[in-house]
C-alpha cells in the first residue's frame, strides 16, 4: 500500500504570503523540461510550489522520505503520482510497477513515455525533498527521465542541494528554470505582508525591513520571530536580534529556548513523540502519543504555527516541516531515550493496523525489537518478496538473530529465495544445509518440500539434471496442494529435466501442467517460462508452426500481464528470432534479436550473448561477412569474459564455425577443435548442436571419418528421441560431408531426406547457409525434374535465396567476367563470333542457377515475354535447343574459367 500523504500536494495554509514575483516567473514553467528549486531548509520551497500548483489538474506530487532510496518504492510512488496527474492514463506502467515486472527504472520510464506519447496537455510532476535521495541508480534513472520525457512534460524538483541530474546540459539548451535561495529570500515588501498576517500588533515598514535584512530574508527565521513574539509577548525586534546571522545548522539552541521551552509539558511531549512519524494521521497520533483525539491535537499544533504541514485536502494527513521535524527527532532521542523503543513499537503496531508493513518494519528496526520484526515478516514478508521489496527484506532478515530464523524455517526459506533471485546459487544450499543441521525441532514434511523445491531449482540452474530430477520428485511427494508456489517450481523443474534428457513428449505434458497451475495462481513468470519451454520442445520435435503458435500465446501473456521488461521476455524474442531465421525471414529475425538485446540493455553485457549470436547468424545467411565479423568480435570478447550454460556456448560456437567455413579459416577451426570439450551425451538440442559444431569443424579440416561417426551417432539419437529439427540439420551437414568426399549418391540421398523433412520443419536458411555446394546439388535435382511438388518449390526458393544473398553464379556473368571469358584462348568460336548481350549473359546465369522463366522475369523486373525472347536469342547464339543443354554449356564455361562446379 502507498501512503496517501506522500502523493498529496500540501494544502495552502492561511496567512501565507503569496509570492507573486516568483509565481510570475513560474508561469512559463511549461516551456522547460526541468524546474529546479534549490535552497537550504526553511526558505519556502514547498510553500511556493504548492501556491503555483493550486488549480492545476494535470499535476502529480511526490513527497520523498529516506525510505524512497529503495528503487521499487521510488518507482511505485513516482508512477502513482503520474497516474494521479493523468487520471490513470498509464495503466500498463502502473501494472508493471505493482507487479515489479520491469528490468530497471530506466526501462520502466521508457514504457511510461510510450504511454504518455498520446497525452496532449501540459503535464507536471513535482518531486519534493530530492536531497534525501542518495542512491546512484535512482540518480541515473532520473537523468534518463529528463533526457527522454515528452516535450509537454515538466519535472519540478525541490532540493536543499544541487541534485545529480546532469543539469548543465539543460542549462546550456535553455531547458532549465532555476530558482535559488537568493530569489526565495523574502523581500522587504513580502516580509511586511508576513508580519501583518502573523503579529497581533502592527509593525512599521522600516522595522519590518530591518528585521528582514537581519535574517537575510530567511522565511523560517521570520516565522520564528513571529512565533517567539506571540509566545513571549515580547517585541519582534528582540527575537530578531537573537536570530541575526543564524543559519539552519545553529538553530537547535534557539528552537529549544524559543519554541520547546515555551510550550507546556503536554505539548512538548506530543511534539517529541509524534516527530518519529514520517507522516501522521489521527490513529497514528493516538497510538504513539497516548493523546485522545489526535486530529484535534494536530490541528491545534498547526494553529500555533509549530511548523506542521497539512498534506491533503481532507486534512487527514500531516507532517512536520523537515527542518523542525529533524530537530524534534534529535531532541526526542536525547530527552526520551528510555521510552524510544516503546514509542517505535507503538508506531509499528499502528502502521500495521492501517496496512503499511513497510513503514512498520522501519519502526520495528528502530526499536530493535527482533520479535516484532519477526512477526511482521512472518505475516507480510512473502507479499513483499512477490512485490520485489528485496532491499528492505534483506535488511530486515539481516537484523534478525540466527536463532530467530532457526525457530521460523519459513524465514530461512525466504532468505534462500532472496539469494536465488540474486543468482547466489552456492549460498542457497549452504544456508539450507546449515539450517537443517542446526534446527532444534524437525521440520514438517511440507517445509521439507519447500526446501527441496528450491534446491531443485538451484540444481537445474547449475546444470545438475539428475539432482534436480531427484529433488523435484521428492518435493512433489512432500508438498500439499496448498503450497502451490513450491509445487509450481518443482513441476517446472521436473519438466525442464525431461526436456534436457530428450523425453520431449513427457516434458511437453509437464510444461502444459505447469502453465495451468501458474495461470490458476497468477504466478505469471512461471506461466511465461512454461510456454517458452513448450515452444522450444515443439521446435525440437520439428513442429515449427505449433512452436510459432505457442510463442504467440506467450507474447499475448507478456502484453496482458505487462511482462515486457522481464529478462524472460528476451528468451521469448530469441526463440522467435531463431524460428524466423529458419524460415528465412531475416529482417524480422534480426529485429527480434535487437529487441531481445534492448530488453537486456540494463543487465551485464554477457546476458546479450545469445541475441548477438543471432545477429551474426543473420549476417552469415545474407553472405555479409564483414558485418558478421564485426558482431563476432564482440561475441568472442563476451565469451572470454563470462561463464555460460552449454546451450549458450553451442549457439555462439555455431556461428563461429560457420564463419570459419565460409572464410576457409582452417587454423581457427583447428585451434577451437583442440580446446573444445566433447559433450558426454547428445540427447537434447543443445548437446546435438555442439556435436554438430565439432563435425562441421572436422569437415572443414578434411577429417571426414570422425565427422561421419559423429553425425551417424547424432542421427541415431535424433531419430530415437524424435529430435526432428536436429535430424534435419544433421542430414544437411552429412550431405556436405558426402559431397566434399566425392560420395555424390549418398550426398543426394541425405539431401532428399532433408528436403522431405523440411516440409515439416519449414527450414530454408539451414540449406542457404551451406552456400554454393548446396546450390549445385539443388540445380541438379531441379534439372532432373523428379522432385515432388513441395520439395521442388522449396529447392527453387532455397536457390533463389542463395543467389540473392551469396551472389553465386549470377555474379559470375557480370561485365568483368564476360570480358575475361571472351579474351580466354579456349572460348568457343561460336561465342566469339556471335557474342551474347549483357542481358542475355544475365539470363544464362539465372537459368544455370535454376530459375524458372517467371522467376527470371521477376529478378530482372521485365515481362515474361521479353525473357522468352532473350532465351530464344541466347539458345540460337549458343547453338543449343533445350534448357538442360544451356545449363551444361554454362557449366563448361565456368569450369574453363576455373570455377569449381
From Swiss-Prot:
Gene3D superfamilies: P-loop containing nucleotide triphosphate hydrolases, Tetratricopeptide repeat domain, Winged helix-like DNA-binding domain superfamily/Winged helix DNA-binding domain. Activated by ATP and maltotriose, which are both required for DNA binding. Keywords: Activator, ATP-binding, Carbohydrate metabolism, DNA-binding, Nucleotide-binding, Transcription, Transcription regulation. GO terms for biological process: positive regulation of carbohydrate metabolic process; positive regulation of DNA-templated transcription. ATP binds at residues 39-46. Pfam families: GerE, TPR_MalT. One of its GO terms (molecular function) is ATP binding. PROSITE patterns: HTH_LUXR_1, HTH_LUXR_2. SMART domains: HTH_LUXR. Residues 853-872 bind DNA. Residues 829-894 form the HTH luxR-type domain. Signal peptide: none annotated. It comes from the Bacteria. Positively regulates the transcription of the maltose regulon whose gene products are responsible for uptake and catabolism of malto-oligosaccharides. Specifically binds to the promoter region of its target genes, recognizing a short DNA motif called the MalT box. Belongs to the MalT family. Monomer in solution. Oligomerizes to an active state in the presence of the positive effectors ATP and maltotriose. This is HTH-type transcriptional regulator MalT. It comes from Klebsiella pneumoniae (strain 342).
Amino acid at each position: 500500500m502507498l501512503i496517501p500523504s506522500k502523493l498529496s500536494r500540501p494544502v495552502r495554509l492561511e496567512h501565507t504570503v503569496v509570492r507573486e514575483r516568483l509565481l510570475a516567473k513560474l508561469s512559463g514553467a511549461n516551456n522547460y523540461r526541468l524546474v529546479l528549486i534549490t535552497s537550504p531548509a526553511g526558505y519556502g520551497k514547498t510553500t511556493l510550489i504548492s501556491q503555483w500548483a493550486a488549480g492545476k489538474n494535470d499535476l502529480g506530487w511526490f513527497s520523498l522520505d529516506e525510505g524512497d532510496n529503495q528503487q521499487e518504492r521510488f518507482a511505485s510512488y513516482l508512477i502513482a503520482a503520474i497516474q494521479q496527474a493523468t487520471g490513470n492514463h498509464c495503466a500498463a506502467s502502473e501494472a508493471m510497477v505493482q507487479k515489479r515486472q520491469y528490468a530497471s527504472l530506466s526501462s520502466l520510464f521508457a514504457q511510461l513515455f510510450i504511454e504518455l506519447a498520446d497525452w496532449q496537455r501540459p503535464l507536471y510532476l513535482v518531486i519534493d525533498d530530492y536531497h534525501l535521495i542518495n542512491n546512484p541508480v535512482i540518480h541515473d534513472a532520473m537523468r534518463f527521465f529528463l533526457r527522454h520525457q515528452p516535450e509537454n512534460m515538466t519535472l519540478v524538483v525541490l532540493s536543499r542541494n544541487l541534485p545529480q541530474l546532469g543539469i548543465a546540459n539543460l542549462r546550456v539548451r535553455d531547458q532549465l528554470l532555476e530558482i535559488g535561495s537568493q530569489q526565495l529570500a523574502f523581500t522587504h515588501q513580502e516580509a511586511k505582508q508576513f508580519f501583518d498576517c502573523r503579529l497581533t500588533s502592527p509593525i512599521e515598514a522600516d522595522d519590518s525591513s530591518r528585521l528582514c535584512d537581519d535574517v537575510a530574508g530567511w522565511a523560517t527565521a521570520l516565522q520564528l520571530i513571529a512565533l517567539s513574539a506571540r509566545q513571549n509577548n515580547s517585541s519582534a525586534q528582540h527575537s530578531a536580534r537573537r536570530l541575526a546571522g543564524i543559519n539552519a545548522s545553529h538553530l537547535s539552541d534557539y528552537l529549544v529556548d524559543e519554541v520547546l521551552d515555551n510550550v507546556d509539558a503536554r505539548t512538548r511531549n506530543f511534539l517529541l513523540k509524534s516527530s518519529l512519524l514520517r507522516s501522521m494521521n489521527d490513529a497514528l497520533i493516538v497510538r504513539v502519543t497516548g493523546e485522545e483525539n489526535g486530529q484535534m491535537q494536530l490541528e491545534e499544533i498547526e494553529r500555533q504555527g509549530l511548523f506542521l504541514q497539512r498534506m491533503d485536502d481532507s486534512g487527514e494527513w500531516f507532517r512536520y516541516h523537515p527542518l523542525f521535524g529533524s530537530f524534534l527527532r534529535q531532541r526526542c532521542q536525547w530527552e526520551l531515550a528510555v521510552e524510544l523503543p516503546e514509542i517505535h513499537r507503538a508506531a509499528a503496531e499502528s502502521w500495521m493496523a492501517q496496512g503499511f508493513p513497510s513503514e512498520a518494519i522501519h519502526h520495528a528496526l528502530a526499536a530493535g525489537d527482533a520479535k516484532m520484526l519477526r512477526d511482521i515478516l512472518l505475516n507480510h514478508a512473502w507479499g513483499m518478496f512477490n512485490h520485489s521489496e528485496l532491499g528492505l527484506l534483506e535488511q530486515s532478515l539481516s537484523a534478525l538473530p540466527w536463532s530467530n530464523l532457526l525457530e521460523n524455517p519459513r524465514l530461512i526459506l525466504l532468505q534462500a529465495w532472496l539469494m536465488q533471485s540474486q543468482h547466489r546459487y552456492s549460498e542457497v544450499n549452504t544456508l539450507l544445509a546449515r539450517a537443517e543441521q542446526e534446527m532444534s525441532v524437525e521440520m514438517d514434511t511440507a517445509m521439507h518440500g519447500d526446501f527441496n523445491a528450491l534446491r531443485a531449482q538451484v540444481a537445474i540452474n547449475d546444470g545438475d539434471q539428475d539432482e534436480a530430477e531427484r529433488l523435484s520428485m521428492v518435493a512433489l511427494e512432500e508438498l500439499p496442494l496448498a503450497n502451490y508456489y513450491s509445487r509450481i517450481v518443482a513441476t517446472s523443474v521436473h519438466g525442464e529435466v525431461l526436456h534436457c534428457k530428450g523425453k520431449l513428449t513427457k516434458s511437453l505434458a509437464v510444461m502444459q501442467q505447469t502453465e495451468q497451475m501458474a495461470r490458476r495462481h497468477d504466478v505469471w513468470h512461471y506461466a511465461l517460462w512454461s510456454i517458452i519451454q513448450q515452444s522450444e520442445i515443439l521446435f525440437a520435435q520439428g513442429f515449427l508452426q505449433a512452436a510459432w503458435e505457442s510463442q504467440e500465446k506467450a507474447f499475448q501473456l507478456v502484453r496482458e500481464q505487462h511482462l515486457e521488461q522481464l529478462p524472460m521476455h528476451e528468451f521469448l524474442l530469441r526463440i522467435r528470432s531463431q524460428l524466423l531465421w529458419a524460415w528465412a525471414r531475416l529482417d524480422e529475425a534480426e529485429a527480434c534479436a535487437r529487441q531481445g538485446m534492448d530488453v537486456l540493455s540494463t543487465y551485464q553485457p554477457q546476458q546479450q550473448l545469445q541475441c548477438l549470436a543471432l545477429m551474426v547468424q543473420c549476417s552469415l545467411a545474407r553472405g555479409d561477412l564483414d558485418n558478421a565479423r564485426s558482431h563476432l568480435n564482440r561475441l568472442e570478447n563476451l565469451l572470454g569474459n563470462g561463464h555460460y550454460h552449454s546451450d549458450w556456448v553451442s549457439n555462439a560456437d555455431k556461428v563461429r564455425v560457420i564463419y570459419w567455413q565460409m572464410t576457409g579459416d582452417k587454423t581457427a577451426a583447428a585451434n577451437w577443435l583442440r580446446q573444445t570439450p566433447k559433450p558426454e551425451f547428445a540427447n537434447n538440442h543443445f548437446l546435438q548442436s555442439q556435436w554438430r559444431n565439432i563435425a562441421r569443424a572436422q569437415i572443414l579440416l578434411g577429417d571426414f571419418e570422425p565427422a561421419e561417426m559423429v553425425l551417424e551417432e547424432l542421427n541415431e539419437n535424433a531419430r530415437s528421441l524424435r529430435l526432428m529439427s536436429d535430424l534435419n540439420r544433421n542430414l544437411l551437414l552429412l550431405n556436405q560431408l558426402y559431397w566434399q568426399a566425392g560420395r555424390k549418391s549418398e550426398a543426394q540421398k541425405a539431401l532428399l531426406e532433408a528436403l522431405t523433412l523440411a516440409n515439416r520443419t519449414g527450414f530454408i536458411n539451414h540449406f542457404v547457409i551451406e552456400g554454393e555446394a548446396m546450390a549445385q546439388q539443388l540445380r541438379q535435382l531441379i534439372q532432373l525434374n523428379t522432385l515432388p511438388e513441395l520439395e521442388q518449390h522449396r529447392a527453387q526458393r532455397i536457390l533463389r535465396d542463395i543467389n540473392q544473398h551469396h551472389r553465386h553464379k549470377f555474379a559470375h556473368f557480370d561485365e568483368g567476367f564476360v570480358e575475361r571469358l571472351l579474351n580466354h584462348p579456349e572460348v568457343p568460336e561460336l561465342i566469339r563470333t556471335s557474342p551474347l548481350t549483357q542481358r542475355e549473359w544475365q539470363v544464362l546465369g539465372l537459368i544455370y542457377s535454376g530459375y524458372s522463366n517467371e522467376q527470371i522475369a521477376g529478378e530482372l523486373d521485365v515481362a515474361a515475354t521479353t525473357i522468352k525472347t532473350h532465351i530464344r536469342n541466347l539458345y540460337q547464339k549458343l547453338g543449343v535447343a533445350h534448357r538442360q543443354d544451356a545449363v551444361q554449356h554454362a557449366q563448361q564455361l565456368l569450369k574453363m574459367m576455373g570455377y569449381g562446379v
